[in-house]
Amino acid sequence: MGIKHLYQVIAENAPDAIKAGDIKNHFGRKVAIDASMSIYSFLIAVRSEGQQLMSDTGETTSHLMGMFYRTLRMVDNGIKPLYVFDGAPPKLKSGELAKRTARKAEATEAHEEAKETGTAEDVEKFSRRTVRVTRDHNAECKKLLKLMGIPYIDAPTEAEAQCAVLARAGKVYAAASEDMDTLCFEAPILLRHLTFSEQRKEPILEIHLSRALEGLDMDRKQFIDLCILLGCDYLEPIPKVGPNTALKLIREFGSLEKVVEHMESDPKKKYVIPEDWPYQDARELFLNPDVREASHPDCDFKWEAPDIEGLVEFLVKDKGFNEDRVRNGAARLQKNLKTAQQSRLEGFFKPVARTDEEKANLKRKHDEKLQEQKKRKKEEAKAKKEAKARPRGAG
C-alpha cells in the first residue's frame, strides 16, 4: 500500500522533486527493484479476458509472463535490474496484513457471487481484489531470474528498505517500487512505473528525496512523521486527517509527539487517535529498519549470460510459453546485457552540491509558486460562491 497521498503532497508542494521521462533515459543504470510489488502488479495486470494467464495444467503464469517480458524491456533499454524480495514482515505490520487478508477473503466471496449473478465488470473487479503473492509465485520468479542471468537478493524484512540501502551506497542508481514508503527508508532516488508495460505509455517517474525534503522544508524525521500521519502500512490512519491536514499539522507542530498532544488536549476532540497507535515504533521501523549493509556478502550480485535451454525447458515445456518468443527473448537478453556494461558518463563525476544562494533561489521560486496556487484557489472559491449566490436565470 505504501503512504497514502504522498505523491500528491510532493507534486503539489515540491514539484522540482519529480522528473518524468522515458525509459531510455536510464540506459546504463543499475536499479534495485522491489520484487514483491512487481509480481503483485504482474498478477493484476497480465491478463486475458479479465482472467489471469494459465498453463495447460491450470497453473497461473501471469507472474512469469510479466517478469520475463517486463525485465526484457528494461534490459532492451540498457538497464541492469537487480530484484530484491521481501523477507518476514515486521511484527507491527501484522495488523495491516491481517486486515488485507480479511479484505481478500471478502473479495473472494464477492467474486464467486459475481460469477453467478454479476456483470463481467463485477467479476473482473472482485477478481483483482483477491490477488496475493504466494511463496510459489516468489520461488518460480526466482527460478526464472536465475535462468535469465538476472541477479536477485532476499531482504531480511522489507524489500524497499534493502533497495534504499543499495541506492545510498551507490551500488545501484535508484530503488524502483510503486510503494512511496521507499522514500521513508531514505532511498535517494525512487523510480515508479519502471515495470509497467509499454502499452500503458506511462512515463518513468524519478523522485528525488533531497529535493522533496527541500521543497517541503522538512528534515527526514519530520518527513517520516508526515508519512505516518498520511497513513502507512504499520498503523491505522487517524479519521478525518487527509493530506492537507497532515501537512498543516506537521508544519504547525513540528513532530508527531506535539501533534498527538494537541489532538488529545483539544476539548472539541476533532480528531480521535486509534486506541492502539504506536507511532514511535512505526517511526523507528523507518529510521532503523532490519537491513543488511551494502558491504554484506549477501548483497553482492552480478549479471550472467542467460541459460537459453534452461529457459526453454522451464517456460516452454513446463509452462506452455511460445518457444520462438522465448528463444528470441533470450537472444535479446544475451546481446543487451553486454551492451548495458557501457557506463554512463555521470558515473565518472560526482554531482555538484547546490550553493546556499541556489537553494535560497529555489525556495523563493517554490514559495512564489505556492502563493500563486493559494491565490488561484481563493479566487476560484470566491467565483464559485458568487455563482451560487446569483439568482437563477440571472446573466
Swiss-Prot record:
Residues 341-349 are annotated as: Interaction with PCNA. Pfam families: XPG_I, XPG_N. GO terms for molecular function: 5'-3' exonuclease activity; 5'-flap endonuclease activity; DNA binding; magnesium ion binding. Its EC number is 3.1.-.-. Its cofactor is Mg(2+). InterPro entries: 5-3_exonuclease_C_sf, Flap_endonuc, HhH2, PIN-like_dom_sf, XPG-I_dom, XPG/Rad2, XPG_CS, XPG_DNA_repair_N. Phosphorylated. Phosphorylation upon DNA damage induces relocalization to the nuclear plasma. Mg(2+) 1 binds at D34, D86, E158, E160. Residues 122-253 are annotated as: I-domain. Binds 2 magnesium ions per subunit. They probably participate in the reaction catalyzed by the enzyme. May bind an additional third magnesium ion after substrate binding. Residues 1-104 are annotated as: N-domain. DNA binds at R47, R70, E158, G231, D233. It is found in: Nucleus, Nucleolus; Nucleus, Nucleoplasm; Mitochondrion. Residues 102-121, 348-395 are annotated as: Disordered. One of its GO terms (cellular component) is nucleoplasm. Belongs to the XPG/RAD2 endonuclease family. FEN1 subfamily. Interacts with PCNA. Three molecules of fen1 bind to one PCNA trimer with each molecule binding to one PCNA monomer. PCNA stimulates the nuclease activity without altering cleavage specificity. Structure-specific nuclease with 5'-flap endonuclease and 5'-3' exonuclease activities involved in DNA replication and repair. During DNA replication, cleaves the 5'-overhanging flap structure that is generated by displacement synthesis when DNA polymerase encounters the 5'-end of a downstream Okazaki fragment. It enters the flap from the 5'-end and then tracks to cleave the flap base, leaving a nick for ligation. Also involved in the long patch base excision repair (LP-BER) pathway, by cleaving within the apurinic/apyrimidinic (AP) site-terminated flap. HAMAP family: Fen. This is Flap endonuclease 1. It comes from Aspergillus flavus (strain ATCC 200026 / FGSC A1120 / IAM 13836 / NRRL 3357 / JCM 12722 / SRRC 167). The gene is fen1.
